[in-house]
Regions:
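Mid/C-terminal beta-alpha module of Rossmann-like enzyme folds, strongest
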Residues: 29, 219-266, 307
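Catalytic helix-loop patch of NAD(P)-dependent Rossmann-fold dehydrogenases
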Residues: 95, 99-103, 110, 123-124, ...
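N-terminal Rossmann NAD(P)H-binding glycine-rich loop of SDR-like oxidoreductase domains
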Residues: 21-37
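NAD(P)-dependent short-chain dehydrogenase/reductase
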Residues: 153-201, 207-208, 214
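NAD(P)H-binding glycine-rich loop region in Rossmannoid oxidoreductase-like domains
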Residues: 59-96, 109
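Conserved C-terminal active-site "lid" loop/helix of NAD(P)H-dependent oxidoreductases
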Residues: 236-242, 259-298, 302-307
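Substrate-binding strand-loop-helix patch
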Residues: 174, 199-210, 229-247, 297
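Adenosine-cofactor binding site in Rossmann-like domains, unifying the SAM/SAH pocket
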Residues: 45-62
C-alpha cells in the first residue's frame, strides 16, 4: 500500500472548520464524479483513495488512516459490482461488499465519523408491482445482492446514528465501463442488437448521484437511515438502449426486444426494481432530473471528450 500523507492541521474557511472527507473507490464512476463536484471546494479537505492508496479490506490500516486523518465523512464508493462473476467469486464479493464495509463502520465509530454508503436495487427480488420504498422487505436473489445487503446491515448495526445508505440502480457515466458506453460502441459496430425488454427500472447518472451526496454533506441536517436515489422515470433495458441510440444519432443498428429467458445470465436480475425516491426528496430537498435529460447530458459530455 502506498503511504498517503497524513493531515497535520485543519484549515478554517470563513467561520467554519474544513471538513475532512474520505472517498473510497475514487477511481470508479461515482468516485470520479465526486472528484469533479468537490474540485476546488474549500469547505472540504478530501482524500481520494482506491485500493492502491487504502485497502479497505484491511481493518488495521483503515482504522489508522481514518483516526489519524481525523476523517469527518466517509463516502464509500467501493464495491464489487460484477454481478455474474460474483456467483463464482463469493469470497471476493463478500470481502468488498460486506467485510470492508464493516471495517469502515468500526473505524468510523472509533473516530466519530459519519458514513455515506452506496448500495443497490439488487437487495430486492423484483417481484413488486409498485416502486420500492426504503421500508419494503428485502430478498436478494444473487450473491451480489446478498453481500450488498449484508454490508447495509452491519453498517447500520455498528453506527446506527452515523450512517446513511443510498440504494441506487443502473449507474452510468462518462467514466469506466457501463451500459451506456457499451451500447454506444455496439450501436456503431453492429447491425443488430438484442436487448431485454422485461426488466424494468430506472437509469442513474452518476453525476446526479454525486450531486445528491454533495447536498447531504453540505446540509446542516443529518438524518441517518436508508434512502433511495435514481433518476426520475421508468424504462426497460430495451427502452434505455433505443433512447441512447436516438440521442447519439445512431440509425444503422436495429435494436430488437427479447425476454430475460432468451438472454440467460448466471445471476438472477430483478424483473422490476423501480425505487421510490420520496424520502430523499422530502428530507434533503433534492431535485432529481428525468432520466432522459441526464442521459442526454452524459452523451453530450462523451461527445465533447471525443472532439
Amino acid at each position: 500500500m502506498k503511504n498517503v500523507p497524513y493531515l497535520t492541521t485543519r484549515k478554517k474557511t470563513s467561520n467554519h472548520m474544513q471538513l475532512n472527507i474520505l472517498i473510497t473507490g475514487s477511481n470508479g464512476q461515482l468516485g470520479n464524479e465526486m472528484r469533479k463536484i468537490l474540485k476546488g471546494n474549500d469547505s472540504f479537505n478530501t482524500f481520494y483513495t482506491d485500493i492502491e492508496e487504502l485497502d479497505i479490506s484491511n481493518r488495521n490500516v483503515v482504522e489508522e488512516f481514518i483516526i489519524t486523518n481525523k476523517i469527518d465523512y466517509i463516502i464509500n464508493c467501493a464495491a464489487y459490482t460484477a454481478v455474474d462473476l460474483a456467483e463464482d467469486n463469493i469470497e471476493i464479493a463478500r470481502t468488498i461488499n460486506h467485510m470492508a464495509v464493516e471495517n469502515l463502520g468500526i473505524a468510523a465509530h472509533k473516530a466519530k465519523a459519519k458514513v455515506i454508503h452506496v448500495s443497490t436495487d439488487y437487495v430486492f427480488d423484483g417481484t413488486s408491482c409498485h416502486p420500492y420504498s426504503e421500508e419494503d422487505s428485502t430478498n436478494p436473489q444473487s450473491v451480489y445482492g446478498t453481500t450488498k445487503l449484508d454490508g447495509e446491515k452491519v453498517l447500520a448495526k455498528i453506527i446506527p446514528n452515523d450512517h446513511i445508505i443510498i440504494r441506487t440502480a443502473w449507474l452510468y457515466s462518462i467514466y469506466g465501463k457501463n451500459f451506456v458506453k457499451t451500447m454506444l460502441n455496439l450501436g456503431k459496430t453492429k447491425d443488430c442488437l438484442n436487448v431485454v425488454t422485461d426488466q424494468i427500472g430506472t437509469p442513474t447518472y452518476a453525476g446526479d448521484l454525486a450531486n445528491a451526496i454533495y447536498q447531504i454533506i453540505s446540509s446542516e441536517k443529518w438524518i441517518p437511515g436508508i434512502y433511495h436515489f435514481t433518476n426520475e422515470g421508468v424504462c426497460s433495458w430495451y427502452d434505455f438502449t433505443k433512447t441512447i441510440h436516438k440521442i447519439a444519432g445512431i440509425t444503422n443498428c436495429i435494436v430488437q426486444p427479447i425476454s430475460t429467458e432468451e438472454y440467460p445470465s448466471k445471476a438472477k436480475r430483478p424483473a422490476y426494481s423501480v425505487l421510490n425516491k420520496s424520502k430523499i426528496k422530502q428530507i434533503y430537498g433534492i431535485k432529481i432530473p428525468y432520466w432522459v435529460d441526464s442521459l442526454e447530458k452524459c452523451i453530450n459530455e462523451l461527445n465533447q471528450d471525443l472532439k
